[in-house]
Amino acid sequence: MLKHIDLYTDGSCLGNPGPGGYGAVLVYGDHRKEISGGFRLTTNNRMELMAAIMGLRTLNAACQVRLTTDSQYVRQGITQWIIGWKKKGWMTSNRQPVKNVDLWKELDAEVARHQIEWLWVKGHSGHPENERCDELARDAASGKELAEDTGYQP
């Protein structure tokens, strides 16, 4: 039987592009873990993706995950758009390369390990876990030791 995990994610970018960060909160029963990270130059969408990737990557074994995000880009991308992108060799319906393809491939690999229910919550609407993820992401984006987002392409 798979463990049931609640995973909340958010990304933030100060400028877009600019310094960015991600935050994730994982809840398993009475256990809670918060993770975050920041990058010198990135975009909001990349940080939204990174939050989901890093949250899922934290799980050591296959789990039943209820992932809540305020990003329709992430939720629709992974549940709908990715099917066509993969069929078309990671091209959009307009025959353009998929943006953030490096992170979409990483997310696709992480998703394959788990059973995931994707939920959307309106950002900045007072949802406690989403607000906490936003705080983690903003704090990470404002940090002094920011990593390089090697996949970012202007």
UniProtKB/Swiss-Prot annotation:
Record GO terms (molecular function): magnesium ion binding; nucleic acid binding; RNA-DNA hybrid ribonuclease activity
Binding sites annotated in the UniProt record for Mg(2+) 1: D10, E48, D70
Cofactor: Mg(2+)
Extent of Basic and acidic residues compositional bias: 126-147
Subcellular location: Cytoplasm
Domain RNase H type-1: 1-142
Binding-site residues, Mg(2+) 2: D10, D134
Annotated catalysed reactions: Endonucleolytic cleavage to 5'-phosphomonoester
Enzyme class (EC, first level): hydrolase
Keyword line: Cytoplasm, Endonuclease, Hydrolase, Magnesium, Metal-binding, Nuclease
GO CC annotations, alphabetized: cytoplasm
Complex and partners: Monomer.
Role of this protein: Endonuclease that specifically degrades the RNA of RNA-DNA hybrids.
Protein name: Ribonuclease H
Organism, scientific name: Aeromonas salmonicida (strain A449)
